[in-house]
C-alpha cells in the first residue's frame, strides 16, 4: 500500500511525524511518503506553480523518517509526490494534520483542502485532516506549537482505515478534530457551514504615511446544527464532511428549465 502525506504548514510541522507514526502503526506494511512545502503555505488554496521552477530537497525529520521539501504549494507537493517520487497514484493521500480547523465554504481558500482535492483529481482516495486551535497565538506560532498531535493522528488513521475499506461516494473526507479530543470523542457526519469566520479589514499606516491592510475576522459559532461549524465548535465533536470535486449546482435540470433561455439567448 502506498500512502502520501502532504500539508500546507510546511515540512517541519510537528503534526507530520505524529501522523506518520499513527499510520505506520495502523498500516504496518504501507510505504508512507511525506512531501510538504518548504515554507508556510496556509490560505493558498489549490494554487499551482506554472511560471517558476520547483526545487525538491530530501529532509531528515526523525531518526527513521525522511520527507521531501518542495519550494512550492501544497498542490505542487501532491503532483511531485505522485508523478516524480512515487511514479504512480497512491492508495491514499492525507493532507494535514493542519494546525487550525478548516470549516465551511471557506475551505476553498485552504491549502490543506487544495492538496486533498488535487489528490482526488488524480484518482487517489483523499483525506484532509485539521485540528482545532482556539488560540490565535498558538495557531500562528508554527514550529514551536506546544500541542501533542498523537491523539488527532490516531483518530485520523482510524478514519482512514474505514475509508479504505469502503467505496464511499465522495472524493474527499474533510475531518475536523476538536482541541483536547480523545479517542472516545463522538464523531458526526456534517455538511459545510456557510462561513467559519466573520470578514474584517484592518487599515494601518506605515512610517511613510501610506496605508496597508490586514484581512482577519472572528470565529463564528452560531450555525445550523448539522454543519461542521456547529458540531466542532458548539458540540466539541469530531466533524467529517464528505466532499466532491464537482461543484455543479445540485438541481441542474431545474436550473436549466427556469433560467436556460434567459442566460443562453443572445
UniProtKB/Swiss-Prot annotation:
Compartment annotation: Cytoplasm
Cofactor or coenzyme needed: a divalent metal cation
Species of the source: Methanocaldococcus jannaschii (strain ATCC 43067 / DSM 2661 / JAL-1 / JCM 10045 / NBRC 100440) (Methanococcus jannaschii)
Residues the record lists as binding a divalent metal cation: 8-9, 42, 98
Protein family per UniProt: Belongs to the SurE nucleotidase family.
Molecular-function GO term, any one: metal ion binding
Enzyme class, spelled out: hydrolase
Main localization (coarse): cytoplasm
N-terminal signal peptide: none
Record EC number: 3.1.3.5
Tree of life domain: Archaea
Entry's cofactor comment: Binds 1 divalent metal cation per subunit.
Pfam families for the chain: SurE
The name this protein goes by in its record: 5'-nucleotidase SurE
Chemical reaction(s) catalysed: a ribonucleoside 5'-phosphate + H2O = a ribonucleoside + phosphate
Function: Nucleotidase that shows phosphatase activity on nucleoside 5'-monophosphates.
Amino acid at each position: 500500500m502506498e500512502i502520501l502525506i502532504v500539508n500546507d504548514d510546511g515540512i517541519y510541522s510537528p503534526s507530520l511525524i505524529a501522523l506518520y507514526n499513527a499510520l505506520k502503526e495502523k498500516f504496518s506494511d504501507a510505504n508512507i511518503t511525506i512531501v510538504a512545502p518548504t515554507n508556510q503555505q496556509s490560505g493558498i488554496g489549490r494554487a499551482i506553480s506554472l511560471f517558476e521552477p520547483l526545487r525538491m530537497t530530501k529532509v531528515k525529520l526523525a531518526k527513521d523518517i525522511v520527507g521531501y521539501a518542495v519550494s512550492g504549494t501544497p498542490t505542487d507537493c501532491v503532483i511531485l509526490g505522485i508523478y516524480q517520487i512515487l511514479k504512480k497514484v497512491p492508495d491514499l493521500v492525507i493532507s494535514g494534520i493542519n494546525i487550525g480547523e478548516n470549516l465551511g465554504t471557506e475551505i476553498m481558500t485552504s491549502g490543506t483542502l487544495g492538496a486533498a482535492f488535487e489528490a482526488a483529481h488524480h484518482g487517489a482516495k483523499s483525506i484532509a485532516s485539521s485540528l482545532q486551535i482556539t488560540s490565535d497565538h498558538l495557531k500562528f506560532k508554527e514550529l514551536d506549537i506546544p500541542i501533542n498531535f498523537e491523539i488527532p493522528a490516531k483518530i485520523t488513521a482510524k478514519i482512514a482505515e474505514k475509508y479504505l475499506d469502503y467505496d464511499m461516494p465522495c472524493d474527499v473526507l474533510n475531518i475536523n478534530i476538536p482541541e483536547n479530543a480523545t479517542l472516545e470523542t463522538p464523531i458526526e457526519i456534517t455538511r459545510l457551514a456557510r462561513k467559519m469566520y466573520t470578514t474584517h479589514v484592518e487599515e494601518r499606516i506605515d512610517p511613510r504615511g501610506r496605508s496597508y491592510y490586514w484581512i482577519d475576522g472572528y470565529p463564528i459559532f452560531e450555525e445550523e446544527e448539522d454543519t461542521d461549524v456547529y458540531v466542532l465548535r458548539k458540540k466539541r465533536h469530531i466533524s467529517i464532511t464528505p466532499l466532491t470535486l464537482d461543484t455543479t449546482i445540485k438541481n441542474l435540470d431545474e436550473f436549466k428549465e427556469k433560467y436556460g433561455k434567459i442566460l443562453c439567448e443572445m
